[in-house]
Amino acid sequence: SPHYNFGL
């Protein structure tokens, strides 16, 4: 699954 980095 794709990984979305929201600055976490």
Curated annotation (Swiss-Prot):
A GO cellular component annotation in the UniProt record: extracellular region
Top-level division of the source organism's lineage: Eukaryota
Keyword Phosphoprotein part of the UniProt annotation: no
Transmembrane segments: none
Subcellular location: Secreted
Keyword field: Amidation, Neuropeptide, Secreted
Modification Leucine amide occurs at: L8
GO biological process: neuropeptide signaling pathway
Sequence similarity: Belongs to the allatostatin family.
Name of the protein described by the UniProt record: Cydiastatin-1
Lineage, broadest ranks: Eukaryota, Metazoa, Ecdysozoa, Arthropoda, Hexapoda
